[in-house]
């Protein structure tokens, strides 16, 4: 992808990058391991973002 992106697309990509984090360790420990993943995890090659 080009280095020069429109601002809107750049903001959307940054938001998607921040959302795509694992569940924190304190949350896994607090729920005794019942919560290990969250449903919004996205792999960059399998799922495309909306344009």
UniProtKB/Swiss-Prot annotation:
Origin organism lineage: Archaea, Methanobacteriati, Methanobacteriota, Methanomada group, Methanococci
Entry keyword annotation includes Ribosomal protein: yes
Name of the gene encoding the protein in the UniProt record: rpl39e
Residue numbers spanned by region Disordered: 32-51
Alphabetic keyword roster: Ribonucleoprotein, Ribosomal protein
Start-end of Basic residues biased regions: 33-51
GO CC annotations on file: ribonucleoprotein complex; ribosome
Database matches in InterPro entries: Ribosomal_eL39, Ribosomal_eL39_CS, Ribosomal_eL39_dom_sf
Family: Belongs to the eukaryotic ribosomal protein eL39 family.
GO molecular function: structural constituent of ribosome
GO biological process: translation
Gene3D superfamilies assigned to the protein according to its UniProt record, in alphabetical order: Ribosomal protein L39e
Name of this chain's protein: Large ribosomal subunit protein eL39
Matches recorded under Pfam families: Ribosomal_L39 (PF00832)
Domain of life: Archaea
């Amino acid at each position: 992808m080009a280095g020069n992106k429109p601002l809107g697309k750049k903001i959307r990509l940054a938001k998607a990058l921040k959302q795509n984090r694992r569940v924190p360790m304190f949350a896994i420990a607090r729920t005794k391991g019942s919560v290990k993943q969250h449903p919004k995890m996205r792999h960059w090659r399998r799922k495309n973002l909306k344009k």
